[in-house]
Amino acid sequence: IVGGTAADISQFPHQLSLQTT
């Protein structure tokens, strides 16, 4: 997942280390 939307963060917390919005 690229973008780090609220829904993405909820499902993929590891995305926080890649990109946060």
From Swiss-Prot:
It is found in: Secreted, Extracellular space. Keywords: Digestion, Hydrolase, Protease, Secreted, Serine protease. GO terms for cellular component: extracellular region. Its EC number is 3.4.21.4. It catalyses: Preferential cleavage: Arg-|-Xaa, Lys-|-Xaa. It comes from the Eukaryota. The keyword Protease applies. One of its GO terms (biological process) is digestion. It is an enzyme of class 3 (hydrolase). Signal peptide: none annotated. GO terms for molecular function: serine-type endopeptidase activity. Belongs to the peptidase S1 family. This is Trypsin. It comes from Apis mellifera scutellata.
